[in-house]
Structure formats: C-alpha cells, structure tokens
Amino acid sequence: MFKIINFLSIFTFCSGIIFSQVKLDVNTIPTKVDIHLDGVNIGSSPIRNERISPGLHRFEIKKKGYAPLSYDLLVNPAQAVELDFFLNPIYECKFKTDEKGLVFELNGEHRWDVDLVRLRLEAGDHLLRVFKIGEIIDEQIINVDQPKKYNYFLKKPLSASN
C-alpha cells in the first residue's frame, strides 16, 4: 500500500511539472505586432497573461515594414516569462551611379552592375563593396536609418600641378 501511495505522489508531482503552464507576457517596439508561438498566431502585442508549457518553443514576430524576427526559447517551469522584442524597420533605398564598368555588392548578398537599383534594407550598418574588373576598388560601411538615395562616385586621385 505504501508503495502505491508513494508512486501516486511521485507521479502527481512529476505530471504537475510536465503539464504545468507558465505565465507569458510579450512586449514589442513597435506595438501591435503579430506574435506566432510554435506556428500559431497568439495575437498582437502586447500579449498579457498568455499560458505556455515548459519546453522548447519558437516565437516569430512579424509586422509590415519591419524585419521579421525568430526567437527560440527553452521555457523552464517558473512563475512567469516576460519577453521584450525590438523590431528593426525596413527602408526603401536607392543606389545610383554614373560610373561605368562597376559591380556593386551589399553585405555579400546583393550584387548589381546597373546604374540604379532599389533595395529594401533593414535599419543598421551594411557593407558596400565596389569591384572593377574583378578587383575590389572600394569598401565602405553604409548606415541605413531612413529611406535614402545613395549616389556613388569613384574617388579620383588629386593631380599634381607644377
């Protein structure tokens, strides 16, 4: 009899840990952002008093005009989980040049050789490389903090005068 009671108390304790729910609050900047938990939309931020089970979970945070964010979280049995997310805006940017024979590369991802290109870029620093005949001739960091048009000119050496 003692073994049965002992087993039941251990089972009840363990099942309480496994199946217990943890309080979840999610804040975002900006607000009114769609929050997906394990592929299910749980609403728009801020999220208050939602319940989440212990274990591994994936959050996906999405809002038009902002870079999407994915976040994996291992939830331990606890009293509460509070998450704060800051989404980076996406800006429409144009790159223009009158120079001929150049190839541009941004962040090792985007490449172009035309005189005008439009890109949607996440706010922050981006690496621009400029190639001519397969060799890097310029490299610079561009800070994107608003919609902007970037005009590229080759740096010309100063000529010596007599």
Describe the residue ranges of each PLM region:
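Sec-dependent N-terminal signal peptides
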Residues: I4-G16
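Short loop/turn and low-complexity linker motifs enriched in small/turn-promoting residues
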Residues: F19-N162
